[in-house]
Swiss-Prot record:
One of its GO terms (molecular function) is metalloendopeptidase activity. Its cofactor is Zn(2+). Pfam families: YbeY. This is Endoribonuclease YbeY. GO terms for biological process: rRNA processing. The keyword Nuclease applies. It comes from Rickettsia prowazekii (strain Madrid E). PROSITE patterns: UPF0054. PANTHER family: ENDORIBONUCLEASE YBEY, CHLOROPLASTIC.
């Protein structure tokens, strides 16, 4: 079971009814099911903030010391490393609950990127959601090898939902 809490701090998000708890749960489940280590956990929790440029800028300054708005910020609740997701992680077997973390999405940046990249807002949001969930479970793109692995997973998951590769 995946419990999703959504906070909408910007009304433009309400125009996109497809972006809801059901979609977020479905995407999250599709990411997690790829890793056997998560199979013993009965309940996951994920917090989503749907916000605007001003708030994402504040968050990016506060937590990353970057003076720029961004499309999405991920705040993992656990210190996971994707390299370990394919081997047995003992700590995951001691609990049947896991709070994955928090994700903040910026409407204006996602909207502008979707227009520039000629894709639907919803499809771009889904890509950013997959990307951010992968960050929550320990993936990153700090070097080319890790970026290629993360992007390959994103492409695979997007294709499951009928969305073409963004790369």
């Amino acid at each position: 079971m995946i419990n999703v809490e959504i906070i909408r701090n910007y009304n433009k998000w309400r125009e996109h009814r497809k972006i809801n708890k059901g979609l977020i749960k479905k995407i999250t489940q599709n990411v997690l099911v790829r890793f056997d280590n998560f199979s013993k956990i009965k309940q996951f929790e994920l917090s989503i903030l749907l916000t605007n440029t001003a708030e994402i800028l504040t968050l990016n300054q506060q937590f990353r010391s970057i003076e720029k708005a961004t499309n999405v910020l991920s705040f993992p609740n656990n210190e996971l490393n994707w390299h370990n997701l394919y081997s047995k992680l003992e700590f995951l077997y001691y609990s049947d609950y896991m709070h994955l973390g928090d994700i903040a999405f910026c409407y204006e940046v996602i909207y502008n990127e979707s227009c520039e990249q000629q894709k639907t807002f919803e499809n771009h949001f889904i890509h950013m959601l997959i990307h951010s969930i992968l960050h929550l479970i320990g993936f990153d793109h700090q070097n080319d090898t890790d970026a290629n692995i993360m992007e390959s997973l994103e492409i695979e998951i997007l294709s499951y939902f009928g969305i073409p590769s963004p790369y």
